[in-house]
Amino acid sequence: MSAHDLKLEEIVNAETLRRKLNELADTADESYTSLPMRKVVLQTLKDALASGRANAEDMLMKDGGGTLCAKRLCYLMDTLIDILFEFATTRAYPTRNPSKAENMALVAVGGYGRGGLAQGSDIDLLFLLPYKQTPWGEQVVEHTLYMLWDMGLKVGHSTRNIDECIRLAREDMTIRTALLDARFLTGDKDLFRTLEIRFEEEIVKGTEPEFIQAKLAERDARHRKAGETRYLVEPNVKEGKGGQRDLHTLFWITKYFYRVKTKEELVKLGVLSRAELKLFNKAEDFLWAVRCHMHFATLKAEERLSFDIQPEIAQRLGYTAHPGQNYVERFMKHYFLVAKDVGDLTRIICAALEEQQAKHVPGFNRIFLTFSRRKRKLSDDGAFISENHRINIARPDIFRQDPVNMIRLFHLADRHGLEFHPEAMQSLTRSLKLINADLRENPEANRLFLEILTSPRNPELILRRMNESGVLGKFIPDFGKIVAMMQFNMYHHYTVDEHLLRCIAVLSEIEHGELKTEHPLSNHLITTIKRDRNLLYVTLLLHDIAKGRPEDHSIAGARIARRLCPRFGLTPSETETVEWLVREHLTMSMVAQSRDLNDRKTIIDFADTVQTMERLKLLLILTVCDIKAVGPGIWNGWKGQLLRTLFYETELVLTGGFSELSRAARDKQAREALAERLSDWPKEERDAYLALPYTNYFLTVSLDDQVRHAHFIRDADQQGRALVTMAKPHAFEAVTEITVLAPDHPRLLSVITGACAAAGGNIVDAQIFTTSDGRALDTILISREFDTDDDERRRAERVGKVIEDVLSGKAHLPDMLAKRTKPKKAARAFKVEPRVEINNTLSNKFTVIEVEGLDRPGLLSELTGLISDLSLDIASAHITTFGEKVIDSFYVTDLVGHKISNATRQGNIKRKLLALLGAENGARTNGRSPQAAA
C-alpha cells in the first residue's frame, strides 16, 4: 500500500510542519526550552494533530477504509513524534560532540509498533539506549514525553538499553510480545537493528512452543473475561472473541514461528490460501473501520460496541434497513459474521502450525493435546481416525468422495466423545461448497444429523462446532439466515443462532438432571415424555429460525418446521406437533407473565389452545429452555412460579379436575375454610372479619395467605394503625411480597407503586383488594435482591417504610421519584412503539388493558395514576419487562364493577395512555401480540 494510496499528504505535510517549527525557533527571542516558546510549539503540534485526525475521519467517511484510516493515524503520529524528537535533540538539548552513550533510538512497540492506530489508541514508545541512561538522555526523554502528554495523548513508555530489553523479554511474555511488534521511528537505526538481531537469536530461536502456548492461554483468559462467546450482542471490538486481539494473536504466533514480516508471506509458505488471506485482510479492515468510527464518534477510546452507539456506527458505515431487519441489526450481523471468520482463521492457522511444522519442533505437540501420536480407525472405510483424542480425516479427499462424510465427521465425534483435529476442520471449511441440495435431501445425512441433534450426550457442543465450521448453516439454509443475527434490544443477550444452541444446552442439562433444584417441574416432566424428547430438540433448533423476516417469526417458523421435519425423518404426527410447538412457543410465557392466573377464563382459554397434556408438557419445557437461554439473569424463580401455576391449573382443566361450581358456591366454600382456620378467634370477631373481604378475594388468594392476612389486619386493628405494611420473602420464587393495608382512595395503587420505584423496588405483580369497611389490602411482589431471607426482609421493610411515609405525607413522592427518573443510557438507544390494547374477551368479569412501551423509572406509578384518573378500578396488575420494553396488563372495571364496553370511552382511554407512553401524535396502535420470550 503506497503513500499515494493512503493520501498521506492530506493527513499532515511533514516538511511544511518541520519548516514552520524551524522558522519559529529561528526567529524567536527566547530559547527553544523557554515557556513561551514551548507553548507556541505545543500549540502548533496540537493544531497539526487535530487537523490530521479530522482529515482522517473525513477520509474514512468517504472511502470506508478501516485499515487505511489506522495507517493514516499512525503516519500522523509517526510524523509528529519524529519532528518532536528531532527538535528535542537538535534544538532543546543539542550535543556538539556526543559520546557513544549520548545516543538513542526511538521505537514504536505494541499496537503502535504494528503500524495501525485508532484515534484514542495508546502510544507505546521505547527509548532505546546503547548503555546506561545519561543526563542528556533524561532531558530528551522528559521533553518528548511531556510534550506528548500535553498534546492530550496516552503514552506508555519505557527507557532501556539493549541488555535490559533482552533480559526482560526473556522473563516477561508481555514485554516479549511488545518487542515482537517493535518498529523503528527515529534516532540511531543501527542501535535498533542490533536489538532486532539479538531478540531473534537470544529470545525467539528455540522458544516457539513456549511463546505459542502462552499466547493461546492468554487468548483463552481474555475470552473468559470479555465473554466466552463471540456472539454477545454488545461485543468488545478489541478484546472480545473474534475481535482485533484475536487477529493480532494469530499474527504474533505466525510471525514468531515462521519468522515472517507480512501476512502475504504466509501464502508463500502454504499456511493460508489466497482466499484465506483475503478473508484475513477483510476482517482486519472491517474491525479497524468499526473501531476507528467508535473512537471518532465517542471522542474516547471506546472499545465496547454498546447499544447506545451501535446506531451511530451503523449509520457511519452506511447500513440501511431491509424488510424484517433494521439497519443496526444488519450492521451487527456483519460484525458477527466477521467474528466468525476470525474463528475460522484461528482453526486454519493452528492446523498449519501443527501439521506443517510443529511435529519437527520438540515439545510443540504439548500445546495442542497429548504426547501420544497413536492413531486408530473410527469407521469401517478408514475415512476417519482418532489422533491425540481428536477426530481427523485419514485422507484429504474424503469429503469430495462422499459429501455425507461432512455430517458423519460430527456424528463420529459425538459417538466417541472426541474433540476435532484442526486439520479436519480446515479441510471441512475448505469443502463447504460440496453441501448442496443433493446432500440436504440425502436420507443418511439427515438420519445422522437427527442423531446428533438429539444425542443423549452433549448435542450443543457438536452443533456448535457444526455452526462454527459453517456446515450447519449450509446443511439447513434457513438456519444459515439467522447465523450471526442480532436483535437490537436489551432483552436478548446473544445472536439468534447462539440463543438456539444455548436452548439445546439447557434441555440437555434438564434431561441429565443437572437443573432439578432450579427447574423441578421440567426435571420431572422430561422423564415422562421419553417418546417425544426428540421433538423438543427439533423444536428448540427451529423455534426462532424465522427471525429477521417481515412476518411473525412464530408463524413463518411453523411453516419452515412443516417443511424440514419430514426431511429429518419425522412422521406426519411428529411433524404436526413440532409445527404447533414452533407456532405457539411464545404463548405460555406470554399468558403466564401478563395474564391473571387467578382468573378462570385465562386458564380455560389457554387449555383450549393446548388441548392435550402431551402438548402442555412439551410447551412447558420448551418455554423454560427458551427463557433461560436468553441470557444471564433473565430467568428467575418468579417466572418459574408463574409457569408452574399455569401448568397445574391447566392440567386440572385437561384432566377433568377443574371445579365447575358456581362463583357463589366457591365463595361460600372459601369462607367456611377460612372460618375453620380461625376457629380459635371469638365467634363475633371471626364473623366480623369474614364479612370484610369481597368474593373476588376469596376466589383468588390461597387459604394460607388468607390466614396470614387475617392476623395482619387483626394486629393492625388492635394497635389502632390505619396504615401498615408487611414483608415476606419468597426465596425459591425470587420475589418478596409486600402487603399494604391502608384507607382506600382512587390513586392508592399509583402512590404505592411510585413509592416502590422511589425505594428501588422492581414490581413484577400486584393484586388489589378492597374491604367492606373502606380499606384497601394491596399485595405487591418485587424482585428479590439479596440471597438471604434476613437481608431481603430488611430491604423489603425499608421499601415498606417508604410506602408508609409517602402515604402518611411524611415524604414527598415527586421529589423522591425525580432522583430516580433518569433513564438508563443504553435504554435511550432504543425506540419501542407504544401500544395499547383494550380487551373484553380475556376475562368474564374484567376488561384487560395491555400497554407496551419504553420502560422508565416511575412508569408504573404514572400508568396506574392515569387509570385511576379515568375512573377505573384496578383489580390486578401484571408487569413484565423485556430489557428496555415493558408490557403491563391491568384487569379493570368501572367504578360500579362493570366492564368497559363503550367504544368512545375505550378510545379516550387509549389516547390518554398512548400520550403517557409517548406515542407520536398519541394515536398509534397495532394488533400484534407481545413477544414474551426469545
UniProtKB/Swiss-Prot annotation:
InterPro entries: ACT-like_dom_sf (IPR045865), ACT_dom (IPR002912), HD/PDEase_dom (IPR003607), HD_domain (IPR006674), NT_sf (IPR043519), PII_UdlTrfase/GS_AdlTrfase (IPR013546), UTase/UR (IPR010043). Has four distinct domains: an N-terminal nucleotidyltransferase (NT) domain responsible for UTase activity, a central HD domain that encodes UR activity, and two C-terminal ACT domains that seem to have a role in glutamine sensing. PROSITE patterns: ACT, HD. Pfam families: ACT, GlnD_UR_UTase, HD. The keyword Aminoacyl-tRNA synthetase does not apply. Belongs to the GlnD family. Residues 380-736 are annotated as: Uridylyl-removing. Uridylyltransferase (UTase) activity is inhibited by glutamine, while glutamine activates uridylyl-removing (UR) activity. The lineage of its organism: Bacteria, Pseudomonadati, Pseudomonadota, Alphaproteobacteria, Hyphomicrobiales. Keywords: Hydrolase, Magnesium, Multifunctional enzyme, Nucleotidyltransferase, Repeat, Transferase. It catalyses: [protein-PII]-L-tyrosine + UTP = [protein-PII]-uridylyl-L-tyrosine + diphosphate; [protein-PII]-uridylyl-L-tyrosine + H2O = [protein-PII]-L-tyrosine + UMP + H(+). One of its GO terms (molecular function) is [protein-PII] uridylyltransferase activity. PANTHER family: BIFUNCTIONAL URIDYLYLTRANSFERASE/URIDYLYL-REMOVING ENZYME, BIFUNCTIONAL URIDYLYLTRANSFERASE_URIDYLYL-REMOVING ENZYME. Residues 737-818, 848-931 form the ACT domain. Residues 1-379 are annotated as: Uridylyltransferase. Its EC number is 2.7.7.59, 3.1.4.-. Residues 496-613 form the HD domain. Its cofactor is Mg(2+). GO terms for biological process: regulation of nitrogen utilization. This is Bifunctional uridylyltransferase/uridylyl-removing enzyme. Gene3D superfamilies: 3.30.70.260, Beta Polymerase, domain 2 (3.30.460.10), cca-adding enzyme, domain 2 (1.10.3090.10). Modifies, by uridylylation and deuridylylation, the PII regulatory proteins (GlnB and homologs), in response to the nitrogen status of the cell that GlnD senses through the glutamine level. Under low glutamine levels, catalyzes the conversion of the PII proteins and UTP to PII-UMP and PPi, while under higher glutamine levels, GlnD hydrolyzes PII-UMP to PII and UMP (deuridylylation). Thus, controls uridylylation state and activity of the PII proteins, and plays an important role in the regulation of nitrogen assimilation and metabolism. The gene is glnD.
